[in-house]
């Protein structure tokens, strides 16, 4: 199809070509072109670099078109393959589907953690830019920034009511933030000798657990800010700490390739899980609803060899995800499919699925009962570092080294 330019567009294009020839030293070509196009020898400033600008704009537009075409192809594929619509699928079967609902920008460095508020329509992102940002996940609106840390914020967690937020940082501190009114830091705790990599509230909300590169886990009293216990046993950097919903046990994972399950009220390690072949980056406790799917996948008969749990998922730099029965210290399932480190895990509230985030830039949805990856979302332009699944609303959020936070609608 022949494109027709207006007289003014032709004149601007000719001037831009003349400027390009002149600035790049094509004197003979410039002279011939001016004569052919009937241009004056006086070059106007507004045409300086115009051809290059138009060229790069076209490339950017082409890239956007390709991205949109990929998303459209994905959507068409789902329709052709007869993927059930949101109306036909029960909430227990909803999974995140492309394209993302929102891609949120504002952080100036990698995102380290994303979490949902337990009650309000808010989510929180932590970043290597030393800030914590609050967003409305339903509208995609930015709310506010919490500042106080002086180095990368490594993890954030809410208490059960969402009244307090705890954060930890490479600046060696743990901070408590009022999330009801002031959004101010109300306490700062010090005690670790190295990067504090993870934090979690115990369910009652009166204590916080922290994990550090100094190889220890510490328990802090919220009311006083005092350290009341130190748990030792890991031989390397402790990457993550996550408390079981009942509160009597918690799990940690480490660069020493192990996961440890601890008794909260004592300093005793209940069990050590040792099948990973590299650093264990992340862990997640399975909800009770996942028990039947995990048991079926493990091939356990309901009468004989039934696994009671509790069950824990772990993701590693060995690119695998493992699911454990921590009551007996046994690995029940291994999920293979990621092409790089597994950095984040979250169970579907309905218990049928597990979602994972990886340095291969994807989010994967795993059908636990059938031990297979049922969907791959090409989620980010760089490593995916964190993921969370809302307990009540059909949303998943992810964070990345590409400095974006993405909101995915489940249907």
Curated annotation (Swiss-Prot):
GO cellular component: axon cytoplasm; cell cortex; dendrite; dynactin complex; dynein complex; growth cone; kinetochore; kinetochore microtubule
Annotated LisH domain residues: 9-41
Keyword Coiled coil: yes
Coiled-coil region(s): 56-83
UniProt subcellular location: Cytoplasm, Cytoskeleton; Cytoplasm, Cytoskeleton, Microtubule organizing center, Centrosome
Keyword field: Cell cycle, Cell division, Coiled coil, Cytoplasm, Cytoskeleton, Microtubule, Mitosis, Repeat, Transport, WD repeat
WD repeat start and end residues: 106-147, 148-187, 191-230, 233-272, 275-334, 337-376, 379-411
Pfam families with a match to the protein in the record: LisH_PAC1, WD40
Function: Positively regulates the activity of the minus-end directed microtubule motor protein dynein. May enhance dynein-mediated microtubule sliding by targeting dynein to the microtubule plus end. Required for several dynein- and microtubule-dependent processes.
Cited PANTHER family: WD REPEAT-CONTAINING PROTEIN POP1
Protein name: Lissencephaly-1 homolog
